[in-house]
UniProtKB/Swiss-Prot annotation:
The active site is at 279 (proton acceptor). Pfam families: NAD_Gly3P_dh_C, NAD_Gly3P_dh_N. Coiled coil: none annotated. The keyword NAD applies. This is Probable glycerol-3-phosphate dehydrogenase [NAD(+)] 1, cytosolic. Belongs to the NAD-dependent glycerol-3-phosphate dehydrogenase family.
Length: 456
């Protein structure tokens, strides 16, 4: 098979690509001439890159697969962004030539001059994600009508923020009422909802999707890993895990795997999905610490030790034998604390360039999912019905009382009663236990609360 040159200059040889596509088509019962239809829902940075990776790998097999992405229509591109986009276009000869060849360059000139308004769905068709202007993608097939996008899709990729997942999939369920075949859904969303009545419990994005659509949980998977979207599209080496039922996770891991993007499979959906939400929580604090200490490696490592011990403690509340915080799971946490929109947000707060009053949707960055997750985790873990034995004091306390960093973040971001500088006090508290003690306490299994996931 002849290799193909991509818009970003990379070459994708055969590498069994068509064979992997054929294998997945057979598993999904697709006959000759029947397209395998894949659609991404939501066009944030990672959702757009994920669709672009599939388009680069499989898009040339037009008689076998159709790859599209849905985003809402009507989002305009402001003048400042249009000017920056024009600079990006002219700095990349390959992109410039592509737009000229597609007769699409002139509209960017007009937008640069203020003579035309561009729209997010329009520029996405040309390969520009509004949340990631500096990293041009391949051109994408964009759909703005949700019903058209999903009604006959075989594989749906949820690229929505967790805060929007339930609402959009409830709408999608209306278009699936008469479906005969059940779609496969891959969720990229990181975050949770907290339900406090009738009993406190966590609701993850895959649970939201199953509840909204009636799609069985065995057909819903979660993909996560140490992934910075722009770096992955620029072919930086990365890996990820796709978690869920054995029926789908192994063939999908094989289908998604590329030379620079290695995908493994794992059965522990709960731990990976909860960790996906938790890491965004603690990434905001990591950004604050980095900015407040002038990028002190020592301070950041102290924060890392304490926040990972809290994460381990929380996952042991949720599942009796959670996946260990190691390998890709640890790497995902590390890279999110090191770099990403949540860490960036924490830095901007600490520098005074943003404030919590500005909300959780930031221009040029999209949704800061860690903010809502801070509120959800803290409010859930503050419920008296979940009380656990304090390791040193002879009394029952809510689990949140054993998570001092989470508590500080809640008071800074949600209650807004502390300044960002107070995050450092959580590290300097002389009464704080050694992180190892919190981990040992969690691993004793004394705190496992199956009700948090709706289990008896």
């Amino acid at each position: 098979m002849v290799g193909s040159v991509h818009v970003n200059g990379s070459v994708n040889g055969g590498n069994g690509t068509e064979e992997r596509l054929d294998e997945l088509r057979r598993l999904l019962g697709k006959s000759d001439g029947d397209l395998l239809k894949i659609v991404g829902i939501g066009a944030g940075a990672w959702g757009s890159v994920f669709a672009a990776l599939l388009q680069d790998a499989y898009g040339r097999f037009r008689e076998k697969v159709q790859i599209r992405i849905w985003r809402r229509a009507g989002r305009s591109v402001d003048r400042t962004t249009a000017e920056h986009l024009f600079e990006v276009i002219n700095s990349r000869e390959d992109v410039l030539r592509r737009l000229i060849r597609r007769c699409a360059y002139l509209k960017y000139v007009e937008a640069r001059l203020g003579d035309r308004t561009l729209y997010a769905d329009e520029i996405l068709r040309d390969g520009f994600c509004l949340n990631m202007i500096d990293t041009p993608l391949c051109p994408l097939k964009v759909v703005t009508n949700l019903q058209e996008a999903v009604w006959d899709a075989d594989i749906v990729v949820n690229g929505l923020p967790s805060t929007e997942t339930r609402e959009v999939f409830e709408e999608i369920s209306k278009y699936w009422k008469e479906r005969i075949s059940v779609p496969v859904i891959i969720s990229l969303a990181k975050g949770i909802e907290a339900s406090l009545d009738p009993i406190p419990r966590i609701i993850t994005p895959t649970q939201m999707i199953s509840s909204a659509t009636g799609v069985p949980t065995e057909n819903i998977l979660y993909l996560g890993g140490p992934n910075i979207a722009s770096e992955i599209y620029n072919k930086e080496y990365a890996n990820a895990r796709i978690c869920g039922s054995n029926k789908w996770r192994k063939p999908l891991a094989k289908f998604l795997r590329q030379p620079h993007f290695i995908v493994w499979d794992n059965s522990d959906l709960v731990t990976h999905e909860v960790m996906g939400g938790l890491k965004n929580v603690y990434a905001i604090g990591a950004g604050m610490v980095a900015a407040l200490t002038n990028e002190s490696a020592t301070s950041k490592s102290v924060y890392f030790a304490h926040c990972t011990s809290e994460m381990i403690f929380i996952t042991h509340l949720l599942t009796e034998q959670p996946e260990k915080l190691a390998g890709p799971l640890l790497a995902d946490t590390y890279v999110t604390l090191l770099k990403g929109r949540n860490a960036w947000y924490g830095q901007m707060l600490a520098k005074g360039e943003l404030s919590p009053d500005m909300g959780d949707s930031i221009k040029g960055k999209g949704m800061i999912q860690g903010i809502s997750a801070v509120g959800a985790f803290f409010e859930l873990l503050s419920q008296p019905s979940l009380s656990v034995q304090h390791p040193e004091e002879n009394k029952q306390v809510a689990p949140a009382e054993l998570c001092p960093i989470l508590k500080r973040l809640y008071r800074i971001l949600i209650k807004r009663e502390l300044s960002t500088r107070d995050i450092l006090q959580a590290l300097r508290d002389e009464t704080m236990n050694d992180p190892r003690e919190r981990i040992e306490m969690a691993q004793s299994h004394a705190f496992y609360r199956p009700s948090l996931l709706g289990k008896p």
